[in-house]
């Protein structure tokens, strides 16, 4: 029986992964969540894992009451996540937490020799060089869970000996595609959370609205597939049917298509290389009638431009724009800044951060901390 652990089990990706695990007889050995004690406790009672972690330490006593008498070990904070990442007898760890908190547990699991199903973008955005190097040294496989990176990964299967020319990274365009900055001045949180195609958590939905999500995926793709910035083309594809494509040396393009449902990439990552029945709607191209492809608007969406600039410069810049974005999005969701301020803050931090080499995880964390401090100054200004 295959075994797994899940960081972020109460979120959108985590809950769908548990459905996949239940259907395909995968043993779940540990669960972790940020703050949703009741949902985590319900999952734990159903699955009886060896260990659970609630990241918020102030929630521990409530979780202990809910799991009293079960014998399940309970931990908190970063140490709790690392304990799960170090567990013996685990085939794969799904990292679907949100934010920079995902980096250290990923590196810990790699050091243990555990394969990773990666849905936490920040792991590769901020610490890509460290993560890819560590995985190569330990012989650890990283299976992408993002639909776009999963699509690219799938298109590469069986073509390992052929030269990759580049990739086409598709984007839905979010809820504000076709709008200009003058149109977006009064955007509300509710409007930004209304994604046309995907059901996701709040932070990633805002990132999709600002196109920051696509910028983060651009950076991820560079590390996952060993690409240069000029080898990646972003294309807005409103229907979210073509999840991404790869282009080979002979100019042939191979794409992966499917209905917009995260269960497919989750299942592919967890069961690779097997393809088995999946509880998703069958794709009917005739139901769509036509598929459209357009260029993104780099002038309106500052976050996308900031990400590409950051990764082109390299070093600590990707970690900086990521940290600034996390602070800006949190401020927007709390009503402290306007929608357009997110892009302004991210670009300002990108422009004002001097480049430094990343040599260890402490360098990544320092870049993140300094960027957050600067972002908070801009938020409070």
What would you call each of these model-derived segments?
Residues 1-381:
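Catalytic, metal-anchored helix/loop core of enzyme active sites in primary metabolism
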């Amino acid at each position: 029986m295959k075994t797994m652990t899940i960081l972020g089990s109460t979120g959108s990706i985590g809950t769908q992964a548990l459905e996949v695990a239940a259907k395909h007889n995968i043993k779940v050995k540990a669960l972790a969540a940020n703050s949703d004690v009741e949902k985590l406790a319900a999952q734990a009672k159903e699955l009886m894992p060896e260990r659970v972690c609630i990241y918020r330490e102030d929630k521990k006593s409530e979780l202990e009451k809910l799991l009293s008498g079960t014998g399940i070990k309970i931990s908190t904070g970063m140490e709790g996540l690392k304990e799960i990442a170090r567990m013996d007898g685990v085939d794969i760890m799904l990292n679907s937490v949100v934010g920079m908190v995902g980096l250290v547990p990923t590196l810990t699991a790699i050091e243990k020799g555990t394969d990773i199903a990666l849905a936490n973008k920040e792991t590769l955005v901020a610490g890509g060089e460290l993560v890819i190097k560590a995985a190569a040294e330990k012989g650890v496989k990283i299976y992408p869970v993002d639909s776009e990176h999963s699509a690219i990964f799938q298109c590469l299967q069986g073509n390992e000996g052929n030269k990759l020319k580049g990739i086409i990274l598709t984007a839905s365009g979010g809820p504000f595609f076709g709008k200009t900055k003058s149109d977006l001045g009064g955007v509300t949180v509710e409007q930004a959370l209304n994604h046309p195609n995907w059901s996701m958590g709040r932070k990633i939905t805002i990132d999709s609205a600002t196109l920051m999500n696509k910028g983060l995926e651009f950076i991820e793709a560079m590390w996952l597939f060993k690409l240069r910035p000029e080898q990646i083309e972003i294309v807005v594809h409103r229907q979210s049917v073509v999840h991404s494509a790869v282009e080979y040396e002979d100019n042939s393009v191979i794409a992966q298509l499917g209905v917009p449902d995260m269960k497919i990439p989750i299942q592919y990552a967890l069961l690779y290389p097997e393809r088995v029945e999946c509880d998703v709607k069958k794709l009917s191209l005739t139901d769509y009638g036509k598929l459209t492809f357009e260029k993104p608007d780099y002038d309106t969406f500052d976050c996308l431009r900031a990400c590409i600039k950051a990764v082109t410069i390299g070093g600590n810049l990707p970690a900086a724009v990521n940290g600034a974005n996390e602070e800006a999005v949190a401020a927007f969701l709390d009503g402290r800044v306007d929608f357009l301020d997110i892009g302004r803050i991210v670009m300002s931090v990108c422009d004002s951060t001097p480049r430094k080499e990343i040599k260890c995880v402490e360098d990544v964390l320092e870049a993140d901390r300094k960027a957050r401090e600067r972002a908070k100054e801009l938020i409070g200004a």
